[in-house]
A protein has these predicted regions:
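Conserved, well-structured functional cores that handle cations and Mg-NTP chemistry
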Residues: 1-191
Length: 191
């Protein structure tokens, strides 16, 4: 499943739409580091892409699915450089470095971060979120196409289609959705 846009339209930057501050406020660095520690995925040495940056990178990829991996990383690092001490500059690594960093990290820390942070957020005054003292949630499910490789096909399979099999392996998921805010939580993935 290819990403179709190599970069954002001219005159716009990813940081114009969302800043590193929004991601880091929703997923605080302390919580990210705590989860990296508990999963044994902290960076053992200083790398171009430390583990906490890779976590934020994966989050940014989910937000900007049509933009190339390298462009998402460049814009993310631009935000990190802006927040860092003057004169420090983070280099955008090559494609193989990005892939190696994501492989080193694995899915465990991202799943654990999701489970720790993504929770229902409705207050008692949120319209449509409560019935008397009970929080209202809906069960929803869907599928998402994933990269066309042997590992994903073995893990998730390919659904049938009118002429054979579908073009991509698909992840099936079910999630609780908080009425009133539409926050998905308690998500479970399956093949």
């Amino acid at each position: 499943m290819a990403r179709t846009i190599a970069e954002l339209p001219k005159g716009s930057r990813i940081t114009d739409y969302i800043s590193i501050g929004v991601i880091s406020k929703s997923f605080p660095l302390d919580k990210v580091n705590q989860i990296l520690q508990s999963t044994g995925k902290t960076s053992q040495r200083q790398r171009e892409l430390p583990a906490h940056v890779v976590i934020y990178y994966v989050l940014a990829l989910a937000l900007f699915m049509q933009v190339s991996y390298r462009e998402v990383l460049r814009c993310l690092l631009e935000g990190i450089d802006w927040l860092s001490a003057p004169g420090t500059r983070t280099k955008v690594t090559g494609k193989s470095g990005i892939s190696q960093a994501r492989t080193r990290l694995g899915s465990g820390p991202v799943k654990e971060l999701h489970d720790a942070v993504v929770k229902p957020i409705a207050g008692r005054d949120t319209r449509g979120a409560w019935y008397r003292r009970w929080r209202l949630v809906t069960l929803d499910g869907s599928t998402m196409e994933t990269a066309d490789n042997h590992e994903n096909e073995a893990a998730f399979g390919r659904p049938g289609a009118s002429r054979g099999r579908s073009g991509y392996p698909q992840i099936r998921f079910a999630s609780l959705v908080e009425n009133g805010t539409h926050v998905l939580f308690g998500t479970q993935l399956a093949g």
